[in-house]
Design a protein with these regions (language model features):
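A charged N-terminal "starter" segment
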Residues: 2-53
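Hydrophobic/aromatic-rich, well-ordered segments within soluble, folded domains that form packed cores
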Residues: 87, 91-93, 312-328, 354-355, ...
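Short, intrinsically disordered, low-complexity segments enriched in Ser/Thr and Pro
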Residues: 110-145, 258, 382, 505-514, ...
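C-terminal amphipathic alpha-helical interaction region
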Residues: 522, 526-725
Length: 725
């Protein structure tokens, strides 16, 4: 089967070179197609009555409650616009606690009294939907018989048109809550967390005399992914069902030559990227960057910053679009954190900042950061946020897939710390010692080549090993996993920041109330903030063992796996803070904890069952046949009087590995029959018993692969999947 897939993949690539490039989608002008399939501000302004438009804009930009009286007007305009573009259906698109999106399509068609059909879509259908809430994860908040749930239109995220091969659907972003009002999704707490942060940030901005009225978080996620030939994908049951390879010996060449990163993009892959970008531009997703990543067949796409809620929707749309477009080019798109052992896995760097409604980035240091006290206040508050809530941030990116990646010299360590860089670290050290007098200047970089321009050099280097790094005018949360929604990492950051800003605002308000100037109040507060939280600052090599030891001395958490990380979400301090800022209540937090535990256990169990199946039905039968062939060859050579010394060694090695594979497969199968117990106990058993048994079984399978003749090995190999493009 492996050799058949190789033949088909090779033929497909050759055929692509002959005909595929000619039939690839023509490139459209981004400026002409951008947002053409979205019900955006421009469309709303043209199609809505003036009063309705202004009312809707107040809801979107100022978070004012939606006026129910405009719902029918907006719905009619939206329906007419969608039908003009060929839409026949609409859907309330939401993000339940599955980690992916959900949708149910309803037709615009309704029967008329004359026996004909008319298109209907009113305010009621726009504002509220009613999916079955019992069929989605609820963490015990809903029983099977408690099925009622509601979707509620989110006017801050523009609706768009999903164009399929045989029809078009109007997609309306919505929140998802239970009949009792509890959040069953990721959008609802994200919106709540943005409001919580805005409230606390505005307290500080008002002290500085700002005219702003709102603050929002902005973000831009860098999505890493793999592309492999679709023939290889369908020949690997582990990729189909688990998203990653559960067996696979390392190829002679991996990423050792460092020749993949920023390298030439293969023609077929580039055609795929062009098509994806075209589709995303049409629905208003501002993708900006594309390039090869470190591992072979690994790539990255990154957008321009947007408001966090819209960016989260757009990120899910990006992943869905990439999966949908890949088959057109004979490719499979893999978002798993570690689809291939021995080469880098994939992450999703979450670039995060705060901006007011006047367009000011609150994390922009300006030309003289040591004099920009408003920036220093917000930056120091982030020290407090990350130091105090490091466990929450670690939990927000925990998953079975990310366990394969974090701390493996390819991704940030599981220890949460902040990289500030030389310039900011120097300023904070000056402040702690009595006051900042200057800002480090990077100077000019002279390449020594007369025809090349002299370059302004940044005051500090970058640190790719840091999980949370300041990168000029934003923080980059680098530990986020490639396959997860960015919603909960955003929620965790927003709540942590809101709590820290609350503390800072309270201190500054008290000082100003006692007749101190804001400058004096800041001067007194900053040294204490820095001193109390400087342990979280680390500018060194996060991969080094020395850092783990140093982090332990500093008292930082080192939660190395998902099972250790998940309880952070139900710690009393976390519950109290989430409830204080009205983001999630105790019941909602415990539900997410239960769902995360169940997801971890189910994910690993699916992988383990697949490993046993593949060992018994794919590897073992062919290994036994090869063992028989070698045994017959040894007997024939011996009978002819030839030397069988080395052949006998090969036979013994194969026989030993076959026995080992069978024993280890049985051991893993027995581990899967373990009585569940509580969710916590089951998760710990899976981590401590099932995962090591999987590792042991894989070792035997991979060793057998290295001995088997290529034409008889049943699975596409790493060499084929990663390098045949």
């Amino acid at each position: 089967m492996g050799s058949s897939a190789l033949h088909d993949a090779t033929k497909g690539i050759i055929d692509w070179g002959k005909t595929g490039a000619k039939s690839a989608q023509p490139r459209s002008k981004a400026t002409e197609i951008f947002g053409s399939l979205t019900f955006n501000d421009d469309v709303q302004r043209r199609r809505l009555p003036r009063d309705a438009y202004k009312s809707l804009r107040r809801t979107i930009t100022q978070s004012q409650p939606l006026d129910p009286s405009i719902a029918d007007v907006v719905a009619t305009a939206m329906k007419d616009w969608a039908i003009e573009h060929g839409a026949t259906h609409y859907t309330h698109w939401f993000q339940p606690l599955t980690g992916i999106t959900a949708e149910k399509h309803d037709s615009f068609i309704a029967p008329s009294a004359e026996g004909r059909a008319v298109a209907e879509f009113g305010g009621k259908e726009l504002i509220k939907g009613e999916p079955d809430a019992s069929s989605f994860p609820s963490g015990g908040m809903r029983s099977t018989f408690e099925a009622r749930g509601y979707t509620a239109w989110d006017p801050t995220s523009p609706p768009w048109l999903l164009v399929g091969p045989n029809g078009t659907t109007l997609v309306i972003p919505t929140a998802f809550v239970s009949w009792t009002g509890e959040s069953l999704d990721t959008k609802t707490p994200l919106l709540r967390s943005i409001e919580a942060l805005s409230k606390q940030a505005m307290r500080i901005l008002k002290l500085f005399g700002s005219k702003a009225e709102r603050v929002a978080t902005t973000c831009g996620p860098e999505q890493e992914y793999f592309l492999i030939d679709r023939h290889f994908y369908f020949a690997r049951p582990d990729l189909i069902n688990a998203g990653r390879t559960l067996y696979g010996a390392r190829p002679p060449k991996g990423q050792e030559l460092e020749d993949q990163y920023f390298g030439h993009i293969p023609e077929r892959v580039l055609a795929f990227m062009h098509d994806v970008e075209n589709e995303l531009y049409k629905v208003g997703v501002p993708v900006k960057t594309r390039h090869n990543e470190v591992a072979p067949s690994q790539y990255e796409v990154a957008p321009i910053f947007e408001m966090a809620n819209v960016a989260t929707d757009h990120q899910m749309m990006t992943m869905e679009t990439m999966r949908r477009i890949a088959p057109k080019y004979g490719l499979a798109c893999l978002f798993h954190e570690k689809p291939f052992a021995g080469v880098n896995g994939s992450g999703k760097h979450l670039n995060w900042s705060m901006s007011d409604d006047l367009g000011n980035n609150l994390l922009n240091p300006g030309d003289t950061p040591h004099e920009n006290i408003q920036f220093l206040v917000f930056c120091a508050a982030m020290l407090l946020a990350v130091n105090k809530w490091q466990g929450l941030l670690r939990m927000s990116i925990a998953s079975a897939g990310n366990d394969h990646r974090l701390g493996a010299n390819e991704a940030p360590p599981a220890i949460i710390s902040i990289f500030l860089g030389d310039m900011l670290t120097d300023i904070f050290q000056q402040i702690e010692k009595g006051g900042a007098k200057q800002t480090k200047d990077g100077g000019i970089l002279d390449t020594g080549v007369s025809v090349l321009p002299k370059l302004p050099r940044d005051a500090g280097d970058r640190n790719r090993t840091s999980p949370f790094a300041f990168t000029g005018n934003k923080f980059e949360f680098r530990a986020v996993s490639s396959n997860q929604s960015i919603a909960f990492p955003n929620i965790a950051l927003n709540v942590a920041a809101a709590d820290a800003l609350d503390h800072v605002a309270t201190e500054l308000e008290a000082a100003v109330k006692s007749k101190k100037s804001i400058e004096k109040a800041v001067k007194e507060l900053l040294p204490k903030l820095i001193k109390d939280n400087k342990r979280i600052i680390f500018n060194g090599n996060g991969y080094a063992d020395e850092w783990r030891k140093e982090a332990g001395k500093r008292g930082l958490l080192n939660l190395t796996n998902t099972v250790d990380s998940l309880p952070e979400i139900v710690k009393p301090a976390v519950i109290k803070t989430f409830e204080k800022h009205k983001v999630l209540n105790e019941r909602e937090l415990h539900a997410r904890y239960e769902i995360a535990l169940e997801t971890y256990v189910k994910t690993v169990n699916v992988e383990a069952q697949l490993m046993v199946l593949m060992a018994n039905r794919y590897i073992l039968p062919l290994a036994l046949k090869y063992q028989k062939d070698v045994a017959e060859s040894v007997a024939a050579v011996r009978e002819a009087g030839g030397s069988t010394k080395e052949a006998k060694k090969l036979l013994d090695e194969i026989a030993s590995l076959v026995d080992e594979l069978r024993v280890r497969a049985d051991k893993l199968a027995k581990a899967l029959d373990h009585a569940a117990g509580s969710a916590e106990k089951h998760a710990k058993f899976v981590r401590d018993t099932v995962v090591p048994a999987m590792t042991a079984l894989r070792e035997a399978g991979d060793q057998i692969e290295l001995l088997m003749p290529h034409e008889t090995w049943p699975l596409p190999t790493y060499r084929e999947m990663l390098f045949i493009k």
